[in-house]
């Protein structure tokens, strides 16, 4: 792999969603507090509940006193006053666009009945994902003892969110949220700066620095590529956007994507013992892609073993 450009960040990871390759890393396994990146897992479980029919986007949920308190003094914007009722869609968008802590807690209570039960679900899902270093203590990311993760594992949550529930981008890509006649711009400066960026979440904590999970989709060679970047330890909100954009730009300009096999393409056969046919075709239901350094595509010779 070619070396990435100089990125003013303590750690990062860049993932190509189509080829399922990691293109670049720096200290991806360092322990970090997840801060508001916690909301990626919160969002995953909410979309999972919607997908399972446990609640609907148009359902309304109350902003409890506990949810409202989560936003007070946290540095995150509050979405609504205690006692207000908002739809699941509004709460999801508030969490995505504004990083609203009260929205995260209200959604947790709406999905699981209580914050404690929701946090238990978060940690079970982390185990399902195979995450070894991630522990959640709340759904919004406020600093508490025992809440921890790594850039690699947070990036994997982002990848799974996009893979399993791509409809989440409907809320993450919004440049602003209008609620009660008040318009509030997204706190994701990169989304406002780069039209190819359509998510995901920004965060800040003393031990984390300015961090973000970002995703971008750009047309390349007649198709589209989606990249996911997770960057931690930048010195400011502006630097967070600038350095993440630099990493994404390199991911697109430094690599070509080669299609090894098309979806449904028969690439070999397997013999069948005493079957109605003597053999069956072998292939993949999805296209097989690989990202290679720019200019090296002609050297790729796919083989099946």
Where do the model's predicted regions map?
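Domain-terminus/edge residues, biased toward the C-terminal soluble/receptor-binding domains
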Residues: 132-135, 143-305
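Active-site-adjacent loops and short helices of periplasmic peptidoglycan-processing enzymes
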Residues: 1-152, 159-165
């Amino acid at each position: 792999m070619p070396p990435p450009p100089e990125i003013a960040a303590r750690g990062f990871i860049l993932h190509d969603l189509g080829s399922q390759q990691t293109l670049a890393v720096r200290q991806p396994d360092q322990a970090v507090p997840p801060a508001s990146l916690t909301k990626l897992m919160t969002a995953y479980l909410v979309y999972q509940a919607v997908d399972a029919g446990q609640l609907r986007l148009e359902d309304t949920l109350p902003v409890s006193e506990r949810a409202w308190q989560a936003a007070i003094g946290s540095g995150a914007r509050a979405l609504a006053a205690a006692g207000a009722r908002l739809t699941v869609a509004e709460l999801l968008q508030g969490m995505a666009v504004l990083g609203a802590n009260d929205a995260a807690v209200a959604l947790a209570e709406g999905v699981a009945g209580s914050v404690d039960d929701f946090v238990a679900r978060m940690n079970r899902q982390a185990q399902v994902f195979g995450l070894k270093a991630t522990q959640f203590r709340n759904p919004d990311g406020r600093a508490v003892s025992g809440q921890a993760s790594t850039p690699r594992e947070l990036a994997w949550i982002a990848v799974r969110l996009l893979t399993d529930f791509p409809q989440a981008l409907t809320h993450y890509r919004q440049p602003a949220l209008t609620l009660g006649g008040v318009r509030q711009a997204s706190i994701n400066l990169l989304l406002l700066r780069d039209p190819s960026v359509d998510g995901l979440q920004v965060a800040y904590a003393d031990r984390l620095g300015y961090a973000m999970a970002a995703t971008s989709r750009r047309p390349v060679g007649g198709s589209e590529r989606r990249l996911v970047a997770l960057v931690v330890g930048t010195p400011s909100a502006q630097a967070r956007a600038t350095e993440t954009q630099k990493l994404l730009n390199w991911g697109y300009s430094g690599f070509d994507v080669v299609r090894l096999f098309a979806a449904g393409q028969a690439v070999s056969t397997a013999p069948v013992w005493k079957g109605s046919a003597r053999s069956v075709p072998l292939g993949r239901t999805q296209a097989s892609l690989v990202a290679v350094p720019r200019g090296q595509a002609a050297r790729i010779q796919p083989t099946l073993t």
